[in-house]
């Protein structure tokens, strides 16, 4: 019985220490805000690129030319970006509908790490963003929370 309780305590501590706290993070150039792991380092915050890095996650966000782009173009764009980056074992493309964005994502393997590749288009078709999230553990639920948190700051 003591072993069972010891196991239970150790299991609870493992879950608590591995829980990932997410905090709002903003790409200042566009006012694009999303939940990112607490303590992640911002490596670049420019007009073109927003890069974040930690021991568990590498997040890259890019603004894309959106002239004449339609919602229907996102699937080919996403597939092309993932192919260009050599993403292996690509999943089917999944549609996500956020309050301010039309979006698509696919999961795959970038080199040896699991990844999500995402395209987001503002519903007014004014901006298109490409996001890649590479992580070193199969922590899909955390990444899915991040994906669902994307929003533009109100002006």
Regions from the PLM with identified roles:
Residues 4-19:
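Sec-dependent N-terminal signal peptides
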Residues 20, 31-34, 38-41, 82, ...:
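Surface-exposed amphipathic alpha-helical segments
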Residues 21-26, 48-49, 97-107:
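Short, hydrophobic/aromatic-rich segments at coil-to-beta transitions
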Residues 30-75, 109:
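Secretory pathway targeting signatures of secreted, lumenal, and periplasmic proteins
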Residues 38, 78-125:
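Signature of long, low-cysteine stretches enriched in small and polar/charged residues
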Residues 45-47, 112-119, 130, 142-145:
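Short, surface-exposed coil-to-beta transition loops
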Residues 61-62, 126-135:
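Short, well-ordered beta-strand elements
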Residues 71-78, 143-147:
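Extracytoplasmic/secreted envelope proteins and their assembly/folding machinery
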């Amino acid at each position: 019985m003591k072993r069972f309780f010891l196991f239970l305590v150790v299991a609870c501590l493992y879950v608590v220490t591995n829980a990932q706290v997410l905090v709002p993070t903003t790409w200042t150039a566009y006012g694009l805000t999303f939940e990112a792991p607490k303590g992640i380092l911002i490596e670049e915050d420019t007009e073109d690129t927003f890069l974040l890095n930690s021991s568990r996650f590498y997040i890259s966000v890019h603004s894309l030319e959106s002239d004449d782009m339609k919602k229907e173009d996102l699937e080919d764009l996403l597939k092309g970006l993932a192919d260009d980056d050599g993403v292996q074992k690509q999943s089917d493309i999944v549609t996500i509908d956020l309050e301010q964005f039309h979006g698509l994502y696919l999961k795959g393997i970038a080199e040896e790490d699991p990844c999500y590749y995402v395209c987001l288009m503002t519903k007014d078709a004014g901006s298109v963003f490409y996001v890649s999230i590479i992580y070193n553990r199969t922590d899909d639920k955390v990444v899915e929370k991040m994906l669902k948190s994307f929003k533009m700051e109100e002006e």
